Amino acid sequence: MQDSLYVALSAQMALERRLDTIADNVANANTVGFRATGVKFEDMVSGTGQKSVSFASSGKTYLSGAHGSLSETGNPFDFAIQGDAWFAIDTPAGTVMTRDGRFSMNENGELMSIEGHPVLDAGGAPIQLDPRNGPPKAGADGSLRQNDQLVGSIGLYNFDPGENFVRYGNSGIVPARTPEPVTDRSDVGIAQGFVEESNVNPVLEMTRLIMVQRAFENTAALMRQTASSSDEAIKTLGSKS
């Protein structure tokens, strides 16, 4: 009987974590470059044979690899990645990966992220433009030109976010391992004048929310029923003694 209570409790803890991720996804449905979080659950078995009991794990988080849709802005400092890669920005937390390409040029000619951090090239150095020559023209390969002169290139990187990754700012991800620059850009490109929208599907997330809430309610009912049965058993044993 206690096993049922423990199983229900473990399921409830797992559902709470799923609720947290759904709430975060829904809150960022309109965040440029945001990648949704998912949770994978696994059964953990305690005991052996007929006495074995399966418990729900707390879950492992993962980052959705689905691409968000591209929206045209016409802003020459807006960039969207086409393919599997990330921009790199230099922050107080170290190098951060992001798909948010809303950049700008400061008075010193540095290409900056929406949050005011330097955007890095493929070598990991801040991108330096000439502030006197206006917005650059970007090639699909990320090359940047001013007055028809090559002045730099936007770095594109790949990395494994792993489990329990750390978010930074609006849509940044702090990599657990050093990201690798993309050297073969045949399947990866940059679109100037576009941004990538959040890849969160609000309708799908709300459907998941309803399902999780129902499962949570069913689990709570099971816990109440188990506790009630336990109380009845104790009373019965007490009356017999």
Swiss-Prot record:
The record's keywords, sorted A to Z, are: Bacterial flagellum
Compartments in which it is found: Bacterial flagellum basal body
* Cross-referenced Pfam families: Flg_bb_rod, Flg_bbr_C, LlgE_F_G_D1
Question: Which GO BP annotation is one of this protein's?
Answer: bacterial-type flagellum-dependent swarming motility
- A single cellular component GO annotation: bacterial-type flagellum basal body, rod
The record ties this protein, via InterPro entries, to: Flag_bb_rod_N, Flagellar_basal_body_rod_CS, Flagellar_FlgE/F/G, Flg_bb/hook_C_dom, FlgE/F/G-like, FlgF, LlgE_F_G-like_D1
Q: How does it assemble?
A: The basal body constitutes a major portion of the flagellar organelle and consists of five rings (E,L,P,S, and M) mounted on a central rod. The rod consists of about 26 subunits of FlgG in the distal portion, and FlgB, FlgC and FlgF are thought to build up the proximal portion of the rod with about 6 subunits each.
Protein family (similarity comment) = Belongs to the flagella basal body rod proteins family.
**What PANTHER family does this protein's entry cite?**
FLAGELLAR BASAL-BODY ROD PROTEIN FLGG, FLAGELLAR PROTEIN
**Name of the protein described by the UniProt record:** Flagellar basal-body rod protein FlgF
Q: Which organism is it from?
A: Mesorhizobium japonicum (strain LMG 29417 / CECT 9101 / MAFF 303099) (Mesorhizobium loti (strain MAFF 303099))
